[in-house]
């Protein structure tokens, strides 16, 4: 099971309650005792992460940083996820999606990246999207790729 540490110092933006993140991570159904840190960031922080780690001057909704090391309690530290609250909330409006559904999708999408799923080609994209939909259906969330 994946446990999460949520770090949120953002004010004035909608961010789901920690319990939602826990539910989404539980639905991934990862069997090993593990942990992911989710940090809610500002647009400036996300732009900085993109410049530093991807060489791109842009704001993305999420970035996933796989790690996979054991801590002292023999819990696997899978990695970190940065989530830009303002970008996620704005995109929910642009794409006419429910905010909580958008957060669920992007959290699950990011966790799957940390677990090794990719969308670097059509075959991998289909595999990843199917896995996302299998999880999102547990929450009655419609296909996020249909606009």
Name each region found by the language model:
Residues 1-104, 114-147:
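An acidic/histidine-cluster motif and surrounding catalytic segment
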């Amino acid at each position: 099971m994946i446990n999460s540490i949520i770090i949120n110092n953002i004010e004035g933006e909608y961010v789901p309650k920690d319990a939602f993140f826990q539910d989404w991570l539980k639905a991934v159904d990862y069997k090993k005792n593990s942990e992911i840190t989710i940090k809610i960031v500002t647009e400036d922080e996300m732009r900085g992460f993109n410049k530093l780690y991807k060489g791109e001057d842009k704001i993305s909704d999420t970035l996933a940083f796989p790690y996979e090391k054991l801590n002292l309690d023999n819990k696997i530290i899978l990695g970190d996820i940065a989530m830009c609250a303002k970008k996620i909330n704005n995109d929910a409006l642009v794409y006419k999606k429910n905010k909580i559904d958008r957060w669920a999708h992007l959290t699950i999408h990011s966790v799957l990246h940390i677990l090794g799923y990719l969308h670097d080609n059509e075959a991998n994209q289909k595999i990843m999207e199917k896995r996302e939909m299998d999880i999102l259906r547990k929450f009655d969330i419609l296909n996020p790729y249909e606009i």
